[in-house]
Amino acid sequence: QLSSRFVAEGAALGDLDRDGHCDLVAGNVLYRGPAFTDTRRLYDGQPFDPASYSDHFFAFVHDLDGDTWNDVVVIGFPGQDAVWYRNPRTTDGAWTKHLAFRGVDNESPTFTDLDGDGRPELVCMHEDRLGYAKVDWQQ
């Protein structure tokens, strides 16, 4: 058990500090691997009541801006916007928030390569339709 606090419905693994070890993202907390005892905050947030839901359903780790550092995509409560946080490339830097996609409507989106180009798309419901959103890799 990493924490007794309820901060997310789901978590993600990926090397966020480029030390060769997987790190874990759960809610607004980054647990640095391999021991997962050193933590950093990705954004402001508070723990949630375990009898309720959090506003952080899924996270995905991928280099979204092409700088070779993994960033974090966060899918919040169903119907909320998906956002991503740019990796500051330092252990104490601020993770800047960016809009990824408006109104992700289901509880089980995924971030996977659908078109075979080696880059993931966000597969989700949006306005009662199933589809996917592509990252604009030129920006």
Each model region followed by its residue ranges:
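Beta-propeller-forming repeat regions
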Residues: 1-139
